[in-house]
Amino acid sequence: MKIDDKTSHNSPSLRFPEFTGEWEESTIGKEFDLYSGNTPSRLNKEHFKGKVNWISSGELKNHYIYSSKEQISEDAAKNLKLLPKGTFVIAIYGLEAEGVRGTGSITQEPSTISQACMAFIPQGDIENEFLYSWYKKHGEVIGVRYAQGTKQQNLSYDILEKFKIAYPSIKEQKKLNKFIALLDERIAVQSRLIEDLKKLRCAVSNKLFQSVKGVVIPLSGISNIVKGKQINGDFLAEVGEYYVMNGGTEPSGYYDNYNVEANTISISEGGNSCGYVQFNRMPFWSGGHCYTIQDIVSDVETLYLYHYLKSKEDSIMKLRIGTGLPNIQKKDLAEFKVIIPAIEQQRRISNILSLLERKTEIEGRMLIAMRTEKQYLLHQMLI
């Protein structure tokens, strides 16, 4: 590859050496027919008993989509456009959610789509694979800046058709597409490795705890369950020294102080993820929707207790009450039963599971690095 020193805005910064000159410029509306689908009536149960792919916006996470979660009948598909294999489809509804913005996939089977999706059918010299990469570069920004709506942020035909797109010759497109597909395949392989490691850890954990024998004690008999302290969201930052756990699986922000020491177990108290068990290696702030397990008795290893509770996460989540904002009562968590074997067995179990968890975390960081590298290359190789 070569770095292009030209100042022209129609030539990318990083390019394969055999290609020179400026790229062409057009608009999405000129180069593609745009089509948004629909949802067959669910009043007719036969509509969703067929074999025709019907893609919804939440399924557009990977480069390629082979099959949909729901299939519709041929009769239901008559009222929808059957998109050919190789069609690029993006999510256009619910873009206020970070995991939805910028998502899109290329169909690998003839498919129909819901109204929450938009399909791009080429009419000119831009291949869908190239459009996929272009959207992966720009889609997040498009969702943040241009989606409309109050509670739900959506994109429409009128918005999308106006976007300018610069593109090279078909020959250069094909080489770019092949290169980016290799990056995506590497990311996909890494993602599968992580999923396999998670499954392995789960299987090993189940096997170890199914055979463990020891004293059965309620959680409150071996520890102190402490509810966190709520912080006004105005005081939270996007980055900082101490993360804040407050009812979710990810930090809700960062604060300039902490109220829980490192190497502490936390359990989500409220929200859709209440019951989520986490081991915190760093000091952090425990919010109002977070329990921490403190003052663990000396004959119980903290890591053993963490792995035991993590293996029982589904059971802990079943302690939740309420519907709108479910939560777990402290008194119910206090009575949760824990099997405590001899200290040597505790250490043996925690060592095995900690190694598997550590391996998964390392591979996860590698995946983040791969995705960051891909985004860098997209920004350098596309306009």
Which residues does each predicted region cover?
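A short glycine-rich beta-alpha junction/loop motif
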Residues: S8, P12, P110-M118, Q148-K171, ...
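Non-catalytic DNA-recognition/assembly elements of restriction-modification systems
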Residues: S11-T39, N62, K162, K207-Q230, ...
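Hydrophobic aliphatic residues
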Residues: F32-Y35, Y93, Y135, G139, ...
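Short coil/turn segments at secondary-structure boundaries
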Residues: S41-K49, A147, G233-G240, I321
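Short beta-strand/loop turn elements enriched in aromatics
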Residues: N44-K61
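A short beta-sheet element
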Residues: S56-S57, S67-K136, N246-K312, R320-G322, ...
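Amphipathic alpha-helical coiled-coil/heptad-repeat segments
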Residues: M1-T27, K164-P218, E335-I383
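Right-handed beta-helix
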Residues: E140-V144, D314
